[in-house]
Structure formats: C-alpha cells, structure tokens
Amino acid sequence: MLRYCFIYGILAFVLSGCSLVAQKPADDYQLLAMQHLQQQKNWALDGRLALADDKDSVSLSISWRHDPQLDELDLVGPLGQGRVKISVTSNQVVVDDGDSRKVFDGQANAIISEQLGLDLPIESLKYWVLGVSDPRLAFTEQPGGFYQAGWLVRYREMQDVNSDTLPKKMTAEKDKARIKLIVDQWILS
C-alpha cells in the first residue's frame, strides 16, 4: 500500500510539473503590446480546433503552416478519422479530402465555411491565432481580447514562444458560431 502511495505521489509531482512550462494566464494578454506580430511572415502551429454553431459541431486536430503566399491547414477528425487538407492563396482555395481534390476561385472565408459547413473566417483567423487583430479591419479592444467583424475574440491562456508571448487558448464567437483553438506547439521563423 505504501508503495502505491509513493508511486502516485511521484506521478502527481511529475504531471503537475508539466503544466508549469511557460504558460501564462490570460491576464498577460495586451493587444497593443502584441501588434508587432501582425508583421510575422512565417509561422506554424499544431493544436486542437473546435467549431460549433446551433446545428452542428466538430472537434479536429489542426496543423497550420503560414507564409505570405500560402496558408496550409491539415484538419484531422477524432481518432484520425477523416482528413481535409486546405490550401489558401490570394485567389484560390484547394480542398483535398483524400477522395477528391477541388479547386475554387473566390473569397476564401465563404469557400471554406461552405466546405466545412461551419463558419471559419480564415482571412482574419490567421492574425487572431497570433493574438492580434486583422490590420485590414476596424476593431474594439476588450479585456482579454477584442471585437472585430462581428466576432468577439478572447485569449484564455498565453505561452512564451522564443522571445514573444503567443496564445495557448483562444475563442471567437459570432452569433451562434463558436471557434475554440488550443495551440500545443508554435514555430516562428
């Protein structure tokens, strides 16, 4: 019995240490101090994404690679079931679900939302995930986030990445649409 208590004690100690690694409460979020990240040209993130509205919801793993010419999103369903790769350039969206590859011309937000069946404002989200507002649109700062284009964007937890502080947990809500992102890993270059 004493042996099991010792093992559980060690396990609790080790696991609690994992949660102390460079994470900060959302109180550390300050939009103006982060605006320089609008200039971040290349980045990548791996994490978990949840999308929901009043009719549907989905939870996905996400890998997102961004550079000025291309956004590549790899979305995978629970237990690896279902995969969609989305590539976005300034004038084209390519959606590949493994069975078919579809090429669309037009506005990325509308195309992606139609293909996923849920609202995903990709053109602004590529800024929001960095903790900054979309520089092309007006915004109103709020405690822990901001309003932009009808969306309330909030940062629940921050994390140190290189010499910057970036979101660990963020949410965005507009009417009945909800986006929740948890970033497990950032790569800035």
Task: Walk through the language-model features, giving the residues of each.
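Flexible, processing/modification-adjacent segments and terminal tails
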Residues: 99-149
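Gly/Pro-enriched, hydrophobic low-complexity segments
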Residues: 131-189
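An acidic-aromatic
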Residues: 70-119
